[in-house]
């Protein structure tokens, strides 16, 4: 699956790193990436191009939720069981970080 489309690039360019500081769970989610065969969800809220790559920032869950940085190339290089790779959620209608979290979080 293509992790980066022209539409996503356009969103990234409008939301550079630190553009949603202080919004916390009210930050807009630009794209959701996920592991299709296990834990791993990345709610990307900000991004900046670095050479041929993108530095991403968002609310991520592997063992617990935490804010953090990663490179798009890191996600793209992950090789999962059965030949699977990290995928982009193309069906979600949720817009903010809070919309992806349990009610009591």
Language-model region placement:
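Catalytic phosphate/metal-binding cores of nucleic-acid and nucleotide-processing enzymes, i.e., regions
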Residues: 1-105
């Amino acid at each position: 699956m293509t992790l980066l489309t022209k539409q996503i690039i356009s969103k990234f360019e409008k939301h550079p790193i630190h553009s949603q500081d202080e919004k916390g769970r009210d930050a807009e989610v630009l794209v959701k990436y996920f592991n299709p065969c296990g834990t791993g969800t990345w709610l990307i809220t900000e991004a900046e191009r670095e050479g041929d790559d993108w530095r991403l920032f968002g609310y991520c869950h592997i063992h617990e939720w935490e804010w953090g940085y990663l490179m798009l190339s890191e996600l793209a290089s992950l090789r999962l069981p059965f030949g699977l790779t990290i995928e982009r959620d193309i069906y979600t209608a949720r817009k903010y970080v809070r919309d992806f979290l349990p009610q009591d979080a």
